[in-house]
Amino acid sequence: MAHLLDVNILVAWGWRDHADHDRVVRWIAERKMAHGVKLFTSLIPEMGFVRVSVQRSSGRISVQQAAEVLQGMLKSLGKLHQFLPDDLGATEWPSWCGSAARTTDAHLLMLALRHGLVLATLDAGIPGAMLLT
């Protein structure tokens, strides 16, 4: 199975004080033990991780520090990780994307589907994505 990691997965994985940190750490550990698994990131989730990390109310850090944390996270995945270039424009949207708040979710879902991946997320409001439980 191949997953595109959503911003919220990266944020929860990266910060121990996040409410879903332990759940995401367990899920990633399970993926590391499985065969044939690939975990993808793309520009939007990586930039989202940096943006959210810099804006956190607890333990704010610099952009460079956030990038270093992200780099360490991705390096820890070894060969499981691949970067997925974003090759989608902004001209097609699924019918459920009716507001600005859903545009990133919709774009990432469409990107994942285009490349035969499953979007892994903590957001129950993304139809067709895999909700981490």
Locate each region found by the language model:
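Short, well-structured N-terminal submotif of metal-dependent ribonuclease cores
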Residues: 1-41, 56-68
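Hydrophobic helix-cap positions at the C-terminus of alpha-helices
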Residues: 30-31, 73, 111
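Short, conserved alpha-helical segments within structured domains
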Residues: 41-46, 104
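Catalytic metal-binding/acid-base residues of hydrolase active sites
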Residues: 10, 125-126
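Active-site regions of enzymes building and remodeling cell-envelope glycoconjugates
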Residues: 128-133
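Active-site neighborhoods of divalent-metal-dependent phosphate/nucleic-acid chemistry enzymes
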Residues: 76-124
